[in-house]
Amino acid sequence: MIENQSDNIDNKENDLSDQDNALENVSSAQELTTENNELSSQKTEEINTEELKNSISNNDARLEQLEKEHETLKNQYVRISADFDNFRKRQSRDQDDLKIQLVSKTLTAILPIVDNFERARQQLKPESEEAQSLHRSYQGLYKQLVEVLKQQGVSPMRVVGQQFDPSLHEAVLREPSEKFEEDFIIEELQRGYHLEGKVLRHALVKVSMGPGKQNSQEEVEKDKVEGDIDSEENTSEDV
C-alpha cells in the first residue's frame, strides 16, 4: 500500500517535471518566435527602407529628366514664338510695302496731270471774264486733286537752297551762281514728292556750279516768305 502511494507520488513528480519541461519548451518557443518576429520586422524595415531609397532615387532621376524635357520644350516654344512674331512682322511689312507700291504706281500716273495744272496756272493769264471763270473752274479741280494727294500721304519736296542729294534730286542742269555755293540747288524744274516718308518722284533741279556764296539768311527768309505767299494764292505748295 505504501509502495503504491510512493509510486503515485513519483508519477506525480514526473508529471510535474514533464509539465515544467513543457512550459519551458513553450516559453523557449515563444521567445524564439518573438526573436524571429523581431528579426523579420527588422529585415522588413531594412527592405522597406532600401526600397524607399531606390524609389526616391528613381523619382529624383525622373524629376531631373522631366526638368530637362521641360527646359527643352520651353526653349522650343520661345524659338517658335520668336519665329512666328518675326514672320508676322515680316508679313505686315510686306503688305505695307505692297500697298505703298500699288499706291505709288497710281499716284505716279496722276502726277503729270498735277504738273499740267501747275504749268497752266503759271503760263495762262486769262483776261476776259469768261476766260477767268473757266480758269477758276480748272483751278477748283486742281485744288480737289491736290487735296486727294494730301489725303493719300503725298507731300512736296522743298528743294531750292538745299544741298543736292541724289537720293532725292535729279540734276538736269548745272550753271555758275553767285548766290549759291557749288552743289546747292538753284531752281526746281519739276517738283518732287514724298509718299509716307519715301520718295515718290525725284525732283528735277538746276544745280549751282559755284563760285558764290550760299544764300544768306535774309535771302532764305525772303524766298520762304515769297513761297508762302505763292502757296496761299495757288495752294499748289500744299500738296
Curated annotation (Swiss-Prot):
SUPFAM superfamilies, per database record: Coiled-coil domain of nucleotide exchange factor GrpE (SSF58014), Head domain of nucleotide exchange factor GrpE (SSF51064)
Annotated segments matching region Disordered: 1-54, 208-239
Comp. bias regions, Polar residues: 19-42
Pfam families for this protein: GrpE
Coiled-coil ranges from the UniProt annotation: none
Function (record text): Participates actively in the response to hyperosmotic and heat shock by preventing the aggregation of stress-denatured proteins, in association with DnaK and GrpE. It is the nucleotide exchange factor for DnaK and may function as a thermosensor. Unfolded proteins bind initially to DnaJ; upon interaction with the DnaJ-bound protein, DnaK hydrolyzes its bound ATP, resulting in the formation of a stable complex. GrpE releases ADP from DnaK; ATP binding to DnaK triggers the release of the substrate protein, thus completing the reaction cycle.
Stated name of the protein: Protein GrpE
Native source organism of the sequence: Prochlorococcus marinus (strain AS9601)
Gene: grpE
